[in-house]
């Protein structure tokens, strides 16, 4: 009889916990939807991504450092992505990574990685991923509990500035990029397609206004190249 009562109590407690868990899940979903409704934006979330070989996957999922990272950055279990990767393959073969940054993550979300090698093995691969995240306004943190490699208070994005064939991942510092248009060269192009004509006409005694009229260009173009060192 006592055994039956104990079994009934356990069953009752389990049902109560299930109902309570379901209630919490619905409340969390309601709060999340309310935040979106009230502010018009998604709540900022954190994701963890790492790569491994087929032999390493089980050891990574059980590793204490993964639990520490998830706790530090408030990462939900469903936001942890561990992808089996052949290190000889290019980053475009990392299907789960592309799915994560292109479709799952939103603006102001954070991607936590143990090191930059998770995003590619070449400078070009790393640049493409980092620039994409920068344009989408997503943050990337390079963090590992053992080495305490983590960004400073000012830095939000691990930005690759090294120009080399082989990358020493552990010596790269996490730093925030200030260059929104880094591929665009700063300043005006040296010289002008009218440089030669302006030089000849100036030496011929023509005034700035006359040169502008002859070449059908603006007076400011002539003035820009008149005494700035391009024309002596």
Curated annotation (Swiss-Prot):
A GO MF label: DNA strand exchange activity
Domain of life according to the entry: Bacteria
Pfam families linked: Sigma70_ECF
InterPro entries associated with the record: HTH_Sigma70_ECF-like, Resolvase-like_N_sf
Protein name as annotated: Uncharacterized protein YagL
